[in-house]
């Protein structure tokens, strides 16, 4: 039986003690400093999960992710989800998992994930994705819904994914492609975060949220040896 006391180091729920989920960037907006951390803490994810806020292209992307996971994640696997939010993906896969571990820096999301995980082989922890308090390697690591594109220390997150799922090909990212920009602009507007800056590699909103998109060339430069496949017209799946 999985004993979290044996596998986890110190779990740090306090934001003051967290070194930032991936050294999140802080920006100045109307004289105030905000970050993705602040925006998520204000409940952005909870609103984003509401299907009525999602353009059709975003809904198709999320459905395609789940379809892929149900093909990749097989019976009895042990899986870790980086940036799990409220545990959506692990909860959907729990019927086939031997163990699911979800991690996120936003403690309120972890509390919500725990609330739905009763009786399932799932554990959720508040921690930093660049310093996961887990000792033993698992079978598979994933970072989905372009969460990796909101992290600034992407290389360190990849290193932790490799450490915790050392088998080549046992790590999966899903990220937005440049084709996602129109759908994301509309989605963020519906969420009350209208886009104020569009750059070749990211969108920035008036609420302080920064979300990146990736070309295949940029992905290969960041990830290294990997397999890249298009997903739902607006994203890529990256296996490494």
Model-derived segments and their meaning:
Residues 87-130:
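Class I SAM-dependent methyltransferase SAM/SAH-binding core
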């Amino acid at each position: 039986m999985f004993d979290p006391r044996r596998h986890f180091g110190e779990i740090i729920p306090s934001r003051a003690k967290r070194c930032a989920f991936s050294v999140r960037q802080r920006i100045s907006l109307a004289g105030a400093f905000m970050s993705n951390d602040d925006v998520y803490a204000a409940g952005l994810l909870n609103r984003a999960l509401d299907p009525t806020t999602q353009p059709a292209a975003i809904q198709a992307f999320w459905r395609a992710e789940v379809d892929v996971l149900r093909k990749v994640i097989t019976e009895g696997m042990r899986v870790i989800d980086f940036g799990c939010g409220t545990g959506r993906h692990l909860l959907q896969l729990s019927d086939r998992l031997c163990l699911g571990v979800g991690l996120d820096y936003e403690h309120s999301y972890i509390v919500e994930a725990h609330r739905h995980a009763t009786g399932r082989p799932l554990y959720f922890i508040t921690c930093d994705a660049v310093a996961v308090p887990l000792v033993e390697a698992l079978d598979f690591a994933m970072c989905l819904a372009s969460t990796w594109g909101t992290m600034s220390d992407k290389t360190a997150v990849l290193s932790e994914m490799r450490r915790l799922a050392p088998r080549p090909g046992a790590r999966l990212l899903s990220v937005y492609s440049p084709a996602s920009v129109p759908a994301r602009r509309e989605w963020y507007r519906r969420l009350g975060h209208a886009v104020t800056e569009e750059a070749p590699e990211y969108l920035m909103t008036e609420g302080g949220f920064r979300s990146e998109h990736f070309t295949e060339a940029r992905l290969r430069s960041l990830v290294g040896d990997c397999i890249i496949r298009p997903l739902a017209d607006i994203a890529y799946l990256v296996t490494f």
